[in-house]
Amino acid sequence: MKLKCAILDDYQQVALKMADWSALADRVEVSAISAHFTDETELAVHLQECDILVIMRERTPMTASLLARLPQLKLLITSGMRNAAIDLAAAAERGVVVCGTRSGSAAPMELTWALLLGLAKHIVPESVGLKNNGPWQRDLGVTLQGKTLGLLGLGKIGGQMARVAQAFGMRVLAWSQNLTAERAAQEGALLAPSKRALFEQSDFVSIHLVLSDRSRGLVGRDELAAMKPTAYLINTSRAAIVDRAALVDVLQQRKIAGAGLDVFETEPLPADDVFRQLPNVLATPHVGYVADDNYRAYFTEAVEDIAAFLAGQPIRRLG
């Protein structure tokens, strides 16, 4: 009897096309589910006969209670090599092997620049106005050359951001808890003397940190209050790094110029969420990693993970 594998949250209905699953055909029956289930009981009904699950980032949390309702589950694969929505301890207790796939940094970096440029050039309101016969040239754009980009985090994506910023002729400041002046200089950036200084001096602040106990809530009321009234905040990292209530306040009161957001504490974003309504927010539905090359890598390596597991030699194990 073949093992049953389900790919969850295949929103674009491309998972089965992005990799060659035929190598598994003799031993595994693979199906993809495009619908997103918010009710755990309903989800468990759909998955209770599955031996293998392939999940996309944190779209569907793998909680202890859900794992307990999946008696057949043997292998859980996530895109990326980190997933805070998986209860690794509960998976281990149940003997579920958890594996990951590698993730490219180009796509989220490019999306960050798309948001930044969209805000600076007022692309969405200008386009909407044009299509609706609104005012011609409604807003005054912001020139990037000579402006300061503040990077909260200078890892792989942050470093790429710094290099692109220099091509625009921007000054780059960077800060994180362990960042040194030498490391910043390697990317052509200056080390900000403090976190507050980064927010005070930057025209654009872009967040590029992994969510952890240290980074959760790292951007709060004090940091947002220190920003220039003409400055923009961009977060394509993780929503919980920023104090949501504080961000909503400064946006509603227009104490900063605006925000570009690709990540939210609840995803999909509820229909009545304030971030859907604020005119000074440019928001996208967590599409930073949703790109052709990333998806090919995710699902190709998911096939590899399954094949290795079937051979008794799991690869890219988490936990």
Model-found features: residue ranges?
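C-terminal helix-to-coil terminal segments
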Residues: 2-3, 92, 100-111, 129, ...
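Short, conserved active-site loop motifs that form the nucleotide-linked donor/cofactor pocket
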Residues: 28, 96, 189-190, 280-282
